[in-house]
Amino acid sequence: MSNRSGVNRRELLKTLGIGAAALTMSPFLSRALLADESSAGAGATKKVLFFTKSSGFQHSVITRKSADELSYAEKLLTEWGSKNGFDVTCSKDGSLFTPDYLAKFDAIAFYTTGDLTKDSDKYKMTPKLDADGKPMKDDKGKTIMEKGELLYKEPGMGDAGKAAFLDAVKNGKGFMAFHSGSDTFHSKGHPHKLGELLRDVSEDGKDEFDPYIQMLGAEFIIHGAQQPSVLKAVDPKFPGAEAFNNASFSEEWYSLKNFAPDLHVILTQQTEGMKGPMYQRQPYPETWARMQDKGRVFYTSMGHREDVWAKPEFAGLTLGALRWITGQVEVDVTPNIKEVTPEADPKAWK
């Protein structure tokens, strides 16, 4: 690959904040991070809103200790961005989702859960004490926790905010989501039970997907125990994807459903050898891209664990996705789901 800007591999890793040890451990990383090295620092800085509100389970990587202290993932994305031409604004405030506010950004990134139209204030959780001042246990011996002081508020975006956000993507705003971004705004009648994994269907037989799920391209069903699994890069040309080809590492892998027929699959979940009934299915999309009218959409189910965020490969894929959704690089995202994962739908499970 040509090095048009004159930035060598080691220099770019330094720019990304990735040290020499990572360079040694990841000899295949160059193409992932040099997918369009000339875009780093070239032209106007792209503005990205990183939204990490949790209306459901809040993951540790996006948990703040206080309102003003950024979480682990927020710190990393901000740092990667500042060194690569992206100005990242982090927020958990859904009330900001107005047309005027969203117009300030080139792209929006989600690490979210649940119904984001609702408020979801966060409290410090403390052990519940008995009359003697000792922590109480449940019948399984686990310490019972209760709400303590309010740490910060997470206002909902409301129906108007959700509509403004979806319109922004439709009209050309870039969008990407990590991990539980697929555990957000579920379709009507969303089931977690393994026996009810077919598409959500209304009484008249028509699919009733939430418009957010339609935009994203699929939704979360359930996950099993964290375990190693293999990914396959079915589009190694997507910036950062080749580094994950045949990679095996531990993560909280999502079992997904309701895949859009126009997905351009980038990485597939290789299910052979995985433990748990939710994974006894044929390979299915794990990372993908698609177009929502004028908007570029990217999703990866990775990102539960801190050590995954710490991987230089994950930084490379994230930056590659940011460059694509903000129009800095052009990638062929012709739909390929039928060719690369023909039995991805849950009804085709083993």
Language-model-derived ranges and their functions:
Residues G43, D210, Q214-D293:
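Catalytic beta-strand/loop cores that center a nucleophilic Ser/Cys/Thr
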